[in-house]
Amino acid sequence: MSKNVVVIGTQWGDEGKGKIVDWLAESVQGVVRFQGGHNAGHTLWINGKKTILRLIPSGIMHPGVTCYIGNGVVLSPEALLKEIEELEAAGLDVRSRLQISEICPLILPYHVAVDKAREARKGESKIGTTGRGIGPAYEDKVARRALRVQDLFTPDIFDAKLDEVLDYHNFVLTQYLGAQAVSANEVRDQAMALAPAIKPMVRDVSSSIFLAQQQGARFLFEGAQGALLDVDHGTYPYVTSSNCVAGAASAGAGVGPQSLDYVLGITKAYTTRVGSGPFPTELLDEVGSRLATVGKEFGSVTGRPRRCGWFDGAALKRSVRLNGISGLCITKLDVLDGLEKLQLGVGYRVNGEFRDVLPYGAHAVAQAEPVLEELPGWSESTVGVTEYSKLPLNARRYLERVAEVCGVPIDLVSTGPDRNETIVLRHPLKG
């Protein structure tokens, strides 16, 4: 029986992690975000009502669960408070159940300005960021010039750090990117105005989790984006700016690796990608359009259409190795309903040689020609099915082949957006 579970996206994000974290949260006492920022969009459907969470962990929908934003997250005070107000307007108690690490790096207006100016300058060669300042905020962290949450409550320190970092960013904005400078006074005034609302939620999150675990509390560690967007292991440079793999939960939440008992990998029954970057199994035909339409494949944060393709088992195999995945959750199986034939990626041809795992780097992936295996589809509906035996025979065969190619058992199958539309083969927290 696992006490603590890490939930990771195994593809290029948008795998349906939010629903699964929300479903699992009823069995834990705490849910922790450990990387990313408000570029993540976790969509939950509960009793037919849609909720999108960007910063706040998906466990916030459960009254008895405490939610934590760990030090690995880059935090926009403005975005955080807006999200809190939206949830409170829906009747949720948020502030008494949310703890924010005092050492989270802040996202401030100059990060957004730099992010947008860079993408505009790159034109067609742009990475495809969300334009929310995530990358520049992580750059400041690594360059040791970041302002952090704790700095909001010591104005003298905040001012000194702000003047120094803004000298740098305004030079880049005006002299290199050809954009307007950002006003230090405006940044300072906005931050100081928001600080009092944030202060009651600020904690030493690492210690809070440690002490709760000593009392027997169970935790979910909620990943954002997906392993193939990891800044080290993804299709670099078409990646996000943080580590999205399971190992990042330890550093990004401030917990020891022995606290992580089980890794649940979330994957769609097909593959999607937002923005630029190589995508070996991408479909540019009617089938791809059908997957996008039926699957409602539009980004929950940006609204951008997602590119769609066949399930890529060789890419998933890379995620399995990177994350030490204990079991898989297959989402959006119902989107494949009605397709007469399916294709499943089992490897690639790279310079005439067969490879059974996604190569490293965007250039190498762009050269990879997918090796596809054809499987029969099914005409029956899988929407809302909650028992594995009631799935169509060919749907079960498809899932079995997915598990075989990836080398990991399937523990959960999602057959619809609502938390109850889930097939449980093995419960990650109950064995």
From Swiss-Prot:
GO biological process: 'de novo' AMP biosynthetic process; IMP metabolic process
Residues at which IMP binds: D14, E15, G16, K17, N39, A40, G41, H42, T130, R144, Q225, T240, R304
The protein's Enzyme Commission number: 6.3.4.4
Compartments where found: Cytoplasm
Cofactor (UniProt): Mg(2+)
Keywords: Cytoplasm, GTP-binding, Ligase, Magnesium, Metal-binding, Nucleotide-binding, Purine biosynthesis
PROSITE patterns associated with the record: ADENYLOSUCCIN_SYN_1 (PS01266), ADENYLOSUCCIN_SYN_2 (PS00513)
Residues that bind GTP: 13-19, 41-43, 306, 332-334, 414-416
Reaction catalysis annotation: IMP + L-aspartate + GTP = N(6)-(1,2-dicarboxyethyl)-AMP + GDP + phosphate + 2 H(+)
Pathway: Purine metabolism; AMP biosynthesis via de novo pathway; AMP from IMP: step 1/2
Positions annotated to bind Mg(2+): D14, G41
Cofactor note: Binds 1 Mg(2+) ion per subunit.
UniProt xrefs under Gene3D superfamilies: Adenylosuccinate Synthetase, subunit A, domain 1, Adenylosuccinate Synthetase, subunit A, domain 2, Adenylosuccinate Synthetase, subunit A, domain 3
Catalytic residues of the enzyme: D14, H42
Binding, substrate: S300, V301, T302, G303, R304, P305, R306
Any GO molecular function: magnesium ion binding
GO cellular component, one term: cytoplasm
Protein role: Plays an important role in the de novo pathway of purine nucleotide biosynthesis. Catalyzes the first committed step in the biosynthesis of AMP from IMP.
Similarity remark: Belongs to the adenylosuccinate synthetase family.
Subunit description: Homodimer.
UniProt-recorded name of the protein: Adenylosuccinate synthetase
The organism of origin for this protein: Bordetella avium (strain 197N)
UniProt gene name: purA
